[in-house]
Each structure stands twice: as structure tokens, then as C-alpha cells.
Amino acid sequence: MNNEIVKKWLSSDNVPQTDKDIISKMKNEELELAFSNAPLSFGTAGIRAKMAPGTQFLNKITYYQMATGYGKFLKNKFSNQNISVIVAHDNRNNGIDFSIDVTNILTSLELEFICLKIINLLLRQLFSYAIRKLNAQGAVIVTASHNPKEDNGFKIYNETGAQVLPDDGLKVVELMPNVFEMIDLKVANDDSLITYLNEDIFRQYYEDCKQALIKTNINESKEFSIVFSGQHGTACKRLPEFLKLLGYKNIILVEEQCIFDGNFSNTPTPNPENRAAWDLSIEYADKNNANVIIQVDPDADRFALGVRYKNSWRFLSGNQMGIIYTDYILKNKTFTKKPYIVSSYVSTNLIDRIIKEYHGEVYRVGTGFKWVGDKINKIKDSEEFVVGFEEAVGALNSTINRDKDAYQAAALALEIYNECLKNNINIIDHLEKNIYGKYGIIHNDTISFTFVENNWKELVKKSLDKILKYSEKTIGNRTITSIKYNEVGGCYDWILDGDSWLRFRMSGTEPKFKVYYNLYGENLNALSQEAKTINDQIKTLLNL
């Protein structure tokens, strides 16, 4: 801890009195955690942290610091060029104020701006789309996706619409000024450098999204009921609007969760990957006799599908949706070039079996959609895009942008659901009988272990070291054929017999240790039980 920084913080006019009161009551351990000379650094998906006073948290001063580093980075990269940057925020608390702080810093560096009016909450995928459409050089969005309400973030993009890669992230951090330079900084907004986007960008985006669709007839009215929750986020109004343009007329809003609320007051978790996020949606579905539920997270990049199946509810994972998308697109779309998929190393490998039939290829990348976007940028024109996805309910179904896109994912998922209805088959049976029956029965899952200790990264690294040094030849009933560190994937691999594997990594956005399962077998129930047995063995090994 630097005592001079703390003193400076307490005397600065840029620090509100409420924050000064909080600092004054901090214990030494809390001050050590909150204050240091080191700037914040980028994780899997930008910079995310708690909103609080201190150099290691998010506040006006650290946003000044981050925005200055990014602005200098852009000026270095695009020297002697006009630079346009898009700035926006999602629905999180303080998002408006922080986006204004970012804008004020960047305009002080004389960068031209394109940004949405404050009243319009920006959909993250539209952000990526707008960069490409408007030929901008970069973008900043104030968001922490589905993180807890106490958090916010700083996510930056390059001129292709993809999130910046680690090397560029390091350059931005290196260009961030010392926090002493930011504490008493005074900046003013220069409106002459700001252009505000209007509704045209949404209409253009909706039109271009249709290229992700194959059989959807927008003039055909789809009468089945769809329950929708926006988890208090940016898609609460826009996604139903978009789906109605595609002919889905009977959309039932989960009213309590379709209002903008940075506190996420009416949901136990805003992450549709978690089962608890679905409880209220199920109540709505049961009340309205609906058989399908769709959800997106607050910044509308994650999409998830739930369907009624044999008097219960099934929620499809990112892996399952990736498999369904892959099979459907390859079967129903005409490809004039070699088809390709981009997916992470920790995502299912059943797609490799499917695309092999079509003489295509799967490109594997590290965890984080920035790697998916980057790989798409590098693929030659002699190949044709199928889908990009991760196991964490995130997909991209066309190349109009370079980030996960819940709008495209929802539209294609509902098209497939509608086609299954026409063929009198539940989408779950389609997956487990038609697809698994042809390509192999597989159990994919992700188990997360959450750490509450401040030194959680050190604890996770110790766990990963045990994984690498594991000396047994089996796990569960599986033979371990090799154990290695996957440098590109950023994970530790246990390669098992029968085309199966386990992978382990530290989360880049939350204090979690993650285990990824990819197990083939003869029976789904047996595979599920086997995964539980393996999970118990791993917990014992790591003392979790």
C-alpha cells in the first residue's frame, strides 16, 4: 500500500465525500487491497472490478486512468489519421457517469467520437457491428456483463469489431498514467467532437442479422408462445422488438425482469447459465402454457434456451446449442467454400465429428470471445463461416460483427425450434436421438469452484499445479493417456481414452477454478453419474 496515494485520495475534489468516508473507515488489510501503484489489468473479457474507492477498484479516477491509456494507444496505432471511437454503457449502476468520464478523457485527447445517446443502452453485439459499419478505429463499453451488481468494467475493441488481444491490452496498461496524475485531473466535455447515433443503426443491424437465418419466413406468423427474460438488461425492449419483425408474435415478457435495473432486483442471478436465473420464467411459462423460454444476460451477448420436455424443463448449454447450430447450418445452408467453425479448446469436440462429414474444419482458440473474433479475421476468403461459439452460452452466427450475439443466436435457435415443431419432434429428442445417435453420445459440462479468499489466484495456481503433477493413470473408469499444459488454450489437459478429455483453468473474470468435461459413452445417464464420480475425485485431490 502507498500511504501517499491514500492521502492524495482523501484530499482530492474528484473523490466524493461518501468515498472518503469509506476510506477513512478501512482497516489496514482493506487499504492494502484497495490501493497500490499498479494499474488494473485486462482479464478474459476486459477489465472488471468492484465499484469502490481505490486504485484497484472502479471509480472516476481509475476510469480516467484506463481511458487515457486507451486514447494514447489509439493515437500511437493510428498516427496521422482521423480517429473515431464509439463509447457506450449497459444498464449497470454508474454506467452513464463512467461513460461520460471516458468520453471526457478521450475528447480531451482530441479524438472524434461516435456514441449513443445516454438514454439508449447499447447492445454489446451492436457495438461490434457499429465499429465495422461506421469504420471506427475502436470502442469502449462500460460493462461487466453478468457479474454481480457491485461490479462494472472497461471493455475495449479494435477496428475489426473484435475485443483487443492481450498484447494490445498490455500496451494500453503500459500507457496508463500514474494514478497521481489522475487524482486531481480536471477535464471538460467537448461536444463538438461527439456524434450521436440514431435509430438507423438498429434498423440496419436488424436487417443484417437476417443473414444468419436460413429458413425463417418473416411473413409467416409463428403462433407458439415464447417466454422472454432480459435479466434487467439492455435487451429487455429491443430483443422482443426484433423477434416480432421475424414473425414471432406471441412473446410473453417476464415483466419483473424486463425493466432496466442495475441492482438486478428481481433475479437471484443475471446469468442465464445458472439454473436459478430461470425460476421466474418457468412460473410465467407454466401460467401461460408456453413450452419455450429464452433468456439473455444484461449486456445481451449470452443467449440461452429452455424447453419443456416430458413434463419438466431442460436448459440447453452452450455446448449443446453449438452442436445444434453446427448440425442445422451444415445440413440446410449451401456452402460454396470450405466450411469452418471457430470454438474454444474447452468446448465440445462433437462438432469436429459433424463438420468432418462436410469436409470442413474446426479452429480451436483460447477461452474468451476475443480469440474467436480474431480467428475469424485471419481466415482466408477460400473458407466460409458456419458458427463461432463457446461452452458458456455464447455464439456468433454470422460475420457482421466479431462478438457473441444473443440476437442472432436467439433468431436461429427459434428457427430450429420452429422446424422441429413442423417435424413433430422436440428439440431435445432431435439433439439426443438424431444428432447423438449419428455422431456419438456425449456428456459436456462445466463445474466451477468459487473462492472467497483475497489470495484466490494463488490458491487456484496451487490447484492447477496438482493437476499437472497428477501421477495416477486413471480417473473414474477412464485411462489418462496424457497430462499437459495447453498453451494456446490457456488450460491444463487430461487427455482420456475414447476421444474424451478433462480440462482445467482459472477464470479470467471471476474468482473461480473451472473443470470442463467432454466424455463419450453409451448412455447419457451413465455418463452423468460417471462425471459426478470424477468430480468427487477431483475435489478430494484438490481439497475443495
UniProtKB/Swiss-Prot annotation:
CDD domains: PGM2
Active site residues according to the UniProt entry: S145
Domain of life: Bacteria
Cofactor(s) named in the record: Mg(2+)
Keywords attached to this entry: Isomerase, Magnesium, Metal-binding, Phosphoprotein
One Gene Ontology biological process: carbohydrate metabolic process
Protein's recorded name: Phosphomannomutase
Cofactor note: Binds 1 Mg(2+) ion per subunit.
Chain residues that bind Mg(2+): S145, D297, D299, D301
EC number: 5.4.2.8
Family as reported in the entry's similarity comment: Belongs to the phosphohexose mutase family.
InterPro entries: A-D-PHexomutase_a/b/a-I (IPR005844), A-D-PHexomutase_a/b/a-I/II/III (IPR016055), A-D-PHexomutase_a/b/a-II (IPR005845), A-D-PHexomutase_a/b/a-III (IPR005846), A-D-PHexomutase_C_sf (IPR036900), A-D-PHexomutase_CS (IPR016066)
Name of a matching Pfam family: PGM_PMM_II
Reactions this protein catalyses: alpha-D-mannose 1-phosphate = D-mannose 6-phosphate
Gene Ontology MF annotations: magnesium ion binding; phosphomannomutase activity; phosphopentomutase activity
